């Protein structure tokens, strides 16, 4: 949307969620050609860049600096720099701080484009065996008890497929809470997606 002749462009670059071979040629070339890469965790992303011999300068853009850092990045874009945004894994802007930068870019008239690729949300959905035509994405449930209960309660009458991200150490608790709200509903547990030990377990919330 918009963008002036002098402005640079923001590239949202999807990176692998586990298997490095899932990166696209277009993303590799873009990461090599842009002036700057904004990464959620530069210590994590340097491994990816080194693997593909990408020498582009990196800067950190994460949940704790997103508002102020987005302003800095927008200024650099307005000065003509092309910037690529990458997340720790998967597609920027989905359950990560990327949406703030995208919003500020649109407000400033900066052109934003997305380079598609790996996305845990879609990967899990299409191999789950659950209905794919209509779905609801909740990302990670809040850790705050009150907020968490509000969201769980709101799902009680949800008829669409529900996709939730969860960390291994909280998985049992979350499955128990979902069972209390949704009953013995069909569910699929996807682990280690795209990796050597990927597993997909289909059952019900009551049985699992």
Put a short name on every predicted segment.
Residues 70-119:
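Glycine/small-residue-rich loop that forms an oxyanion/phosphate-binding "nest" at active or ligand-binding sites
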Residues 3-64:
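Glycine-rich, flexible N-terminal cofactor/catalytic loop recognition
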Residues 31-37, 109-113, 161-162:
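Short active-site oxyanion
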Residues 61-67, 141-144:
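Conserved helicase motor
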Residues 100-158:
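Class I SAM-dependent methyltransferase SAM-binding "motif I" and its flanking Rossmann-like core
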Residues 8-10, 81-84, 161:
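Loop/turn-to-beta-strand initiation segments
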Residues 7, 161, 165-208:
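A contiguous loop/helix-start segment that scaffolds small-molecule binding in enzyme catalytic cores
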Residues 17-20, 88-92, 168-170, 195:
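Short glycine-rich anion-binding loops that position phosphate/pyrophosphate groups of nucleotides
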